[in-house]
Amino acid sequence: MENQAHNTMGTSPCEAELQELMEQIDIMVSNKKMDWERKMRALETRLDLRDQELANAQTCLDQKGQEVGLLRQKLDSLEKCNLAMTQNYEGQLQSLKAQFSKLTNSFEKLRLHQMKQNKVPRKELPHLKEELPFELSNLNQKLEEFRAKSREWDKQEILYQTHLISLDAQQKLLSEKCNQFQKQAQSYQTQLNGKKQCLEDSSSEIPRLICDPDPNCEIGERDEFIIEKLKSAVSEIALSRNKLQDENQKLLQELKMYQRQCQAMEAGLSEVKSELQSRDDLLRIIEMERLQLHRELLKIGECQNAQGNKKRLESSHLPSIKEPERKRKELFSVMQDQPNHEKELNKIRSQLQQEEEYHNSEQERMRNEISDLTEELHQKEITIATVTKKAALLEKQLKMELEIKEKMLAKEQVSDMKYKAVRTENTHLKGMMGDLDPGRYMSMDFTNREHSRHTSINKLEYENERLRNDLAKLRVNGKSTRTNQNTYEETGRYAYQSQIKVEKNEERLSHDCEPNRSTSPLPPLTFQTKEMTSPLVSDDDVFPLSPPDMSFPASLAAQHFLLEEEKRAKELEKLLNTHIDELQRHTEFTLNKYSKLKQNRHI
């Protein structure tokens, strides 16, 4: 029991302390709640104020944007008005310049007329001497005034152009500044949206903190951390507010500056308008003065014409009457001749058209001729090439023929040598036959042999004559080399056969005469005959188609034939060279003509 009482006594003070602590904690929490509620109300009021300020700033920005748009519209309208005014003034200046040029021309005409009138004798013009200098001085003064005004107008035009250029530059600057303002407004709006989001986040955190109080020991630390966060947020909001106020002040100052600039621009435009109005007034005054001057000039011209007519009437009545009539007749004749002149002009135009057509046709014809000439040149070049080829072929053929003829000459020389040898042999045989003793033959009773010998000699003579006739025919006819070769082969065959017959007869005679003749004269004859016949056989064996033994005139005929062939070849070469020269000259002539035509076309 005592222990239980002691325990109750021990526990009761702890519970009392705990209760006291709980009461203190409740008091602290209630106090902090009150503080937090006060702070939250203050923050809410601040947030409301900030929202109002942001709304006011947005309205100000919208108003400024509207003002900028209005300023732009005004600038555009002012530019259009300035352009229209400048165009009008430029047109008026051009018209005034044209009128001024007309006035100067009329003044020059009047001065020339006055110079012509001054040539008239001074006795006829005594009363005009006093009026003309005064009028001339007035006109000169007015012209100088017009010139001075035109110079002033040119200077003012230059000034207005420079002013317009400056206005364009200012407009560009204003447009750039408006774009900068719009960009700044967009950046401010983004900043305001970010700050609104931060405030919404902080406002969402505050009731969560209020609704979730922890009874643990970490509540104090959390509260302090939250308080620090709130303090930092409040300081940031204050800084951003100060920045926004500074920026708003800057924007207001810039707007004031732009308003001042706009006012200055409006004042300048009003000045420009006033200047333009004064310019209009000056132009009107100038036009009035110009009209007055024109009227005065017309009056002066009428007076001068009247005075001239009076003087002409006074000086010569009849000629003055006849001259206008003559002038009228001339005018009527000129008026009547106008259709004729028009017809002549039409004829000239038609002639010009015909000449142009003829020129075009000639150009086409020349082009066709040039094309034909080019074709002819190509054809001639082709013919020249063919002729050169043919000439080369002919040269080759001539060379071949010359080689063949040289070979033929060599063969003819060999045949001449053979013919000489045969001839000497025949003469020798005839001498030998003449030297024989007839008594021995009579005693030997060789009647048949003598007959055979005479017949063989006659045959040889006949064959020699036939060969000479053949050579004469060859000289006269002048056949080709192939026919000559055939004839040479035939004559060679006949000569060879005759030679064989002569050898046979000699052998017979030698066999018959061996017992009754001395041994001294006959062996050399047989040796000579063998020696003379052996080269013929060897030549025939080596040259089977060689020409026969011919006389000395045959070589002359061959030489004559070769000389004629050479002459013909030279004549052909000369003809070919002349033909080639003519073709070259013709081509050069055509080329020169074509180049001249090209030059004429370029000219």
From Swiss-Prot:
One of its GO terms (biological process) is multi-ciliated epithelial cell differentiation. It is found in: Cytoplasm. InterPro entries: Cep63/Deup1_N. Residues 14-59, 85-197, 227-278, 336-399, 454-480, 557-600 form a coiled coil. One of its GO terms (cellular component) is centriole. Transmembrane segments: none annotated. Keywords: Cilium biogenesis/degradation, Coiled coil, Cytoplasm, Phosphoprotein. The modification Phosphoserine is found at residue 546. Interacts with CEP152; the interaction is mutually exclusive with CEP63. Belongs to the CEP63 family. Key structural component of the deuterosome, a structure that promotes de novo centriole amplification in multiciliated cells. Deuterosome-mediated centriole amplification occurs in terminally differentiated multiciliated cells and can generate more than 100 centrioles. Probably sufficient for the specification and formation of the deuterosome inner core. Interacts with CEP152 and recruits PLK4 to activate centriole biogenesis. This is Deuterosome assembly protein 1. The gene is DEUP1.
